[in-house]
Structures are given as C-alpha cells and as structure tokens.
C-alpha cells in the first residue's frame, strides 16, 4: 500500500493522474472484498507466505533469499495516511467531486486511523521486533485525518470534517508532546533518543512548516548524526531492535533524497543542492537506483531498481526547483 501510494503521488507530481486513479480503483476493489491489509500480490493476492530458499544466494553470496513477505500480517498504522493523501490529490487534481464510493472508502480509512493511532505498530520500516510507538506512524495517522477532513469539506460534510479535524489535532498534540526529545528533535519512538530518517516527513507532509524550530533541529540532527559520509541511514541498527540483524546496512537512497527535500524546506538550499548533485552522480548508466548505496564505493545494494528511491528523486528535484524559483 505504502510503496504503491507513494509511487502514484510522484507520478501525480509529474502530471500523470490516470495511473493514480487506476491504483485507487484497485485498492477500492480490495476494500470492498475484505478488510484492507498492508500489502497484496500484483494480482490482488492476499496470502503471501514467506519462506527462504536455502539453495540460493543473492548478490555476492547474500543470504537468506526470501520469497513472499512475512510483513503481510503486520500492523503498519501509516498506510491509511498514504492512501488518504493520495485520494485527496487524485480528487483535487482531477477536479471532481467526492463520489459515493470514494466517500465510503474515506470514512472507512479515517475510522481505522482514529481507532488505531494510539496503538503501537511495526512502522514504516516493517520491523520484526516488538511493536512500538513510532513517531512516523503517528505522523501519517495525522495525515490520514487531516486529508479526510479536507475531503469531507469538499463533499459538503462540515460536521464530519470538524470531527476529523479534532482527531487530527489530538494526534498533533500527542506527537509534539511525546515524540520530541530535550533537544527539540523528533525521534524514532516515544521516550527514546534514537533518530529515524522517516521523521524528515514532518515538513514534507505538512505537519509543521520548515520555519519551525523543531523541524530545523530534526533535519539538522539527521543530516549530522544519521549519515555515513553524507548519505542517510534509515536508523542505526544498534539503537533499534528491528528483529532482523544488528549488523551494518547501507545508506537508504530514499532517505538521502528526503534529506534533500527537507533541507530545501528549511532554507538550506546550497546544502540541499550539493547532496542532490552527489546523489545524481551515483545513478547507474541507465539512471537507475537501488534501495541502498554504499557511500565509500558508490556501489548499489538491495532491491534494484527500487521505486522508493526514484519517487524520492522526483520529489527532491521538485522541492529544489520550488525553493530556488
């Protein structure tokens, strides 16, 4: 859900609206059949059992090779925000009213966000450890209710819009109270100091403006403290039990492009442009990116090509263009 919605939003940014509309139709069909889950097979499959293929190895002997995805049954409370964000952009971008089918889906997604945002989950990075109170999940729950309120207003449902705005305000207060540490930095989880690159989404999703001191502190803390040779890690494995491994991993390409966007939002244009140009130089001869980059060598690691990396490239380029006029 998350990856697909983010990809469709990037296509919308480039003027391709029909793809996003078709994707939302696919999701609406799934929602009509059964409760929404965090992922589906490309044909709408709901069962994606995970197993390892011990007779195979990946790039340079990497193991284990997995098929399926064990995260299919996880609790990931950010997904409603990504979908409602996309739905609002779709309806506004096509300049159409909120029809009855869309309204039913909006109500269902907003209800799920309302019912679950206070609960721990596995978060945007699909950790396999114990569920936690992830800041980015709270952020995207706020996005869900904020966008739902806008859509209710568009449909002419003022009472529902106000109720969702009230719930969004409660999430906003909770995250700014419990999700910010003594440095004024948004952290990975409530009550812990670990940084997480997903908190770069605070300004990118409109939760707070780039001029806010907490946003500036968070962006600079990540730029200075969650990087390897200037490229951004998701988090530090030794600070976050992800249930997989405590070993080192490469820098995440999407996170580095998020940092470009966030630096542009807080007015650090030269720093944003320098990072963007460095990242562009890492592209393959075909202009493609993998999931991760090894900073010392520029070697691409993980899934290749990775949609997440390219959609963040698009967002970073557009943010730089807007910031520089």
Protein language model annotation of sequence segments:
Residues 1-6, 15, 29, 74-82, ...:
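Aromatic- and histidine-enriched alpha-helix N-cap/loop-to-helix transition segments
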Residues 1-53, 57-67, 74-84, 88:
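Substrate-binding groove/exosite segments of carbohydrate-active enzymes
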Residues 4-18, 82-97, 140-157, 201-211, ...:
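Well-ordered alpha-helical scaffold segments within catalytic/enzyme domains
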Residues 77, 99-162, 197:
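Aromatic-lined, polymer-binding surfaces characteristic
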Residues 18-22, 105, 159-163, 167, ...:
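Alpha-helical positions within canonical tetratricopeptide repeat
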Residues 137, 164-167, 171:
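Heptad-repeat coiled-coil/leucine-zipper interface motif in alpha-helices
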Residues 15, 97-101, 129-136, 156-163, ...:
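A structural signal for alpha-helical segments
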Residues 35-74, 102-103, 108-121, 168-253, ...:
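Extended glycan-interaction surfaces of carbohydrate-active proteins
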